[in-house]
From Swiss-Prot:
Binding site for Mg(2+) 2: 275, 277
Protein name, UniProt field: D-alanine--D-alanine ligase
NCBIfam families assigned: D_ala_D_alaTIGR, PRK01372.1
Single GO MF descriptor: metal ion binding
Pathway noted in the entry: Cell wall biogenesis; peptidoglycan biosynthesis
UniProt GO cellular component terms: cytosol
Pfam families tied to this protein: Dala_Dala_lig_C (PF07478), Dala_Dala_lig_N (PF01820)
Subcellular location(s) of the protein: Cytoplasm
Cofactor(s) the record lists: Mg(2+); Mn(2+)
Organism annotation: Burkholderia thailandensis (strain ATCC 700388 / DSM 13276 / CCUG 48851 / CIP 106301 / E264)
Co-factor binding comment: Binds 2 magnesium or manganese ions per subunit.
Stated family: Belongs to the D-alanine--D-alanine ligase family.
Key words of the record: ATP-binding, Cell shape, Cell wall biogenesis/degradation, Cytoplasm, Ligase, Magnesium, Manganese, Metal-binding, Nucleotide-binding, Peptidoglycan synthesis
Residues annotated as domain ATP-grasp: 108-308
């Protein structure tokens, strides 16, 4: 697909593992990315920042990196800043886009100011009176609700709460993972979708139909009964409109090159954007490879396309 001489990429590090709650997902993503790059003849090597100092990248002659880290310092701008310091080109968003993209609270603030529709929400701080805040939130947002740490990915510690009595405990649990907790009105009736973004590729929307209550960690990475619908069932005009909004939702955060934007539709077909992912999963359950495969792009071709953006 790319027609690029593999030698142009030089020595490439596939960053994988790390120390976040998503370490296992990252290891799985990274191994597949590594194989995909090697299948294309690229000189790619695994590199786990949890086990080796980043300075080794420069010392060992790496000139670019494919970032397959998920969550934590791999996705919040820290790795990106370090790679900038060492002069190593890398896939995905830079410091600002990565930091904002992982922070659901500040993502939603930017979206509210730029006209991107997002579900109504409240924030709770670690150490708040959870019972009192729960009562106030239910009065404002109603039920059901989603409770999620502000800066975790892969649906880590996300809970759908359907009764007011269960909300204080959900807040307490989420606050173990982040000092800021997002409580979001659940958008019901139209289903969940994701828009995969990869440079100039026109990838189809995917409708996600989990067997359980919502698209949680188990549904994303373990279960085999989650349905991924491509085509997504929307008419062409609506799909094009939602892809355009998704791209804008990505761009206004300062995100670049590739990622995902997730959204829900209400019963009337109105979109509500939930979050972006600037370092999306690349496992055999993950969404970008599925979207690419639907338009005839192999896994290896996709990862080479993403890596090729570091040549610009």
């Amino acid at each position: 697909m790319s027609g690029i001489d593999p030698k142009r990429f030089g020595k490439v590090a596939v960053l994988l593992g790390g120390e976040s709650a998503e370490r296992d997902v990252s290891l799985n993503s990274g191994r597949l990315v590594l194989q995909g790059l090697r299948d294309a003849g690229i000189d790619a090597h695994p590199f786990d920042p949890a086990q080796r100092p980043l300075a080794a990248l420069k010392d060992e002659g790496f000139v670019r990196a494919f970032n397959a880290l998920h969550g934590g310092y791999g996705e919040n701008g820290q790795i990106q800043g370090a790679l900038d310091f060492y002069g190593i080109r890398y896939t995905g968003s830079g410091v600002l886009g990565s930091a904002l993209g992982l922070d659901k609270f500040r993502t939603k603030l930017v979206w509210q100011q730029t006209g991107i529709p997002t579900p109504p929400f409240e924030t709770v701080m670690r150490g708040d009176d959870y019972a009192a805040r729960a009562k106030d939130i239910v009065a404002k947002l109603g039920m059901p609700l989603f409770v999620k740490p502000a800066s975790e990915g892969s649906s880590v510690a996300v809970e759908k709460v359907k009764s007011a009595d269960a909300l204080p405990a959900a807040l307490e649990e989420a606050a173990k993972h982040d000092k800021i907790v997002i409580v979001e009105k659940s958008i019901e009736g139209g289903g969940e979708y994701t828009a995969c973004i990869a440079a100039d590729l026109d990838l189809p929307l995917i409708k996600i139909v989990p067997a359980g209550e919502f698209y949680d960690y188990h549904a994303k990475y373990i279960a085999n009964d989650t349905q991924y619908l491509i085509p997504c069932g929307l008419d062409a005009a609506k799909e094009a409109e939602f892809k355009r909004i998704a791209r804008r939702a990505f761009d206004v955060l300062g995100c670049t090159d590739w990622g995902r934007a997730d959204f829900m539709l209400d019963a009337a077909g109105n979109p509500y954007f939930l979050e972006v992912n600037t370092a999306p999963g690349m496992t055999d359950h993950s969404l970008p490879p599925k979207a690419a495969r639907a338009v005839g792009i192999s896994y290896s071709e996709l990862v080479v396309k993403v890596l090729s953006l570091t040549l610009d």
